Design a protein with these regions (language model features):
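A short N-terminal helical cap/helix-turn-helix that marks the beginning
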Residues: 14-37, 56
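Short beta->alpha connector loops at strand-helix junctions that form conserved
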Residues: 103-106
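Sequence-pattern detector for short linear motifs
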Residues: 6, 29, 60-62
């Protein structure tokens, strides 16, 4: 009995096709482009982030993850509400080939535990 079917890939990708590569190319081409905004929880003020600033932050976080022993293929659990920092960590994971595994603040304790057990 057939238990698993893995179809041939519809197309191939390269390192130039990753979300990190897209960010990197954009930052190199137009570093001053507005790419994100975030709101300070205390002051409620909005802050602009340029492509160059975001790339620098992503690279810094990626280096920190590497320093913690994260490498290509590692799984990194991100427990956070949706925010700018979540995106930075997600891009940093992509930059080093790690897999980001989100746990959302709306997930129940049981759901979160199940996700962590799988990792």
């Amino acid at each position: 009995m057939l238990r698993e079917f893995v179809p041939e890939p519809a197309y191939s990708t390269t390192d130039d096709d990753t979300v990190y590569a897209l960010l990197s190319r954009r930052a190199q081409k137009n570093p001053d482009d507005l790419i994100a905004q975030w709101q300070d929880d205390e002051t409620r003020q909005w802050h602009d982030v340029t492509a160059g600033q975001m790339l620098a932050r992503v690279r810094a976080v990626a280096l920190g993850l590497i320093g913690l022993g994260v490498k290509d293929g590692s799984m990194v659990v991100i427990y956070s509400p949706t925010c700018y920092e979540w995106g930075v960590v997600d891009f940093a994971c992509a930059a080093i080939g790690a897999v980001s595994v989100p746990i959302y603040e709306t997930d129940s304790a049981k759901q979160a535990a199940s996700i962590v057990e799988e990792v």
